[in-house]
Regions:
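Peri-catalytic and regulatory segments of divalent metal-dependent proteins
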Residues: 1-133, 139, 143-152
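Active-site metal-coordination segments of metallo-dependent hydrolases
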Residues: 9-20, 174-197
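Short, Lys/Arg-enriched charge-dense amphipathic segments
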Residues: 59-76, 143, 171-174, 233-249
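Short amphipathic alpha-helical leader/targeting segments
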Residues: 86, 154, 206-210
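Intrinsically disordered, low-complexity acidic Ser/Thr-rich regulatory segments
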Residues: 107-129, 174-186, 217-226
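Post-HEXXH active-site segment of zinc metalloproteases
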Residues: 145-185
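Long, well-structured alpha-helical subdomains associated
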Residues: 185-186, 194-249
Length: 249
């Protein structure tokens, strides 16, 4: 690990604390701005099982205020931070005037990382963008009531409380989805992706437009840098998304 990354590296426990703080603040804001009006509640919980993932749970009765919960895995937070470190390390290690370096001429700029952030902020911003997007993805499932949609096309369940688990490509029995069930699974995942991206962009603009966050003359550069790092965060999530299980209970 190079010196720049080593200086901003966190211990696992500190990564967990940071993730809890970031998503806890978002949960608080959403409860005040959205759920309070409905008389409902959004809660955040963490799972210690060593798995890349997150899932959304809805445990409310018909006609009652929404009771939503998003569960995040600590391992997801840990690996995203480590991936962000490795990404920054890799980009700094590209030899000047090498073939890879020359590819950046296509964009008119060989700068690999935004210059408006220091080493610690680079990793931190990639991390925050990635876990925030995953959190918003799960909230997208809840807001669009994908549990109802998937349950309609999935296995039948009795009672007023839904207990089914629905995965990206598998039913709760770990049987591969096919046909209409697979179609509904794909569509709801894409819908949650859209919701997550929309919520994240709105949150990003809210922060950048805050005079206390960044001064006016620096706003464009900072916004551009944050968008760049958000895309990098999405790349850190690629493997997670391919292996992640989304439950809707």
């Amino acid at each position: 690990m190079d010196d720049a990354i080593r200086r901003c590296s966190l211990k696992d426990i500190d990564i967990y604390h940071l993730a809890s703080q970031v998503l806890g603040d978002i949960t608080h804001d959403l409860n005040e701005s959205r759920y309070a009006e409905l008389g409902g509640e959004l809660t955040l919980s963490w799972c210690t099982e060593e798995k890349f993932g997150a899932y959304a749970s809805s445990l409310d009765e018909a006609g009652k205020p929404p009771q939503h919960r998003v569960t995040m895995y600590y391992e997801l937070a840990r690996q995203v931070w480590r991936d962000a470190e490795e990404l920054c390390k890799f980009l700094r290690s590209i030899p000047q005037d090498s073939g890879v370096d020359n590819l950046y001429d296509f964009y008119g700029d060989r700068v690999k990382l935004p210059k408006c952030f220091n080493d610690g902020d680079l990793v931190n911003n990639i991390f925050v963008a990635a876990i925030t997007w995953v959190y918003f993805h799960e909230i997208g499932h809840l807001m669009q009531e994908h549990d109802v949609i998937r349950d309609e096309f999935g296995e039948g369940h009795s009672g007023t409380v839904k207990t089914s688990d629905v995965y990206d490509f598998e039913a709760s029995s770990h049987k591969r989805l096919v046909g209409r069930e697979a179609l509904v699974s794909h569509v709801t995942e894409l819908a949650a992706d859209f919701e997550a991206t929309n919520l994240y962009v709105l949150e990003l603009l809210r922060h950048v437009n805050d005079p206390g966050f960044v001064e006016g003359e620096e706003r464009t550069e900072v916004l551009s840098g944050l968008i760049y790092l958000a895309v990098a965060g999405a790349e850190c999530n690629t493997v997670i998304e391919l292996t992640q299980e989304h439950h809707i209970a």
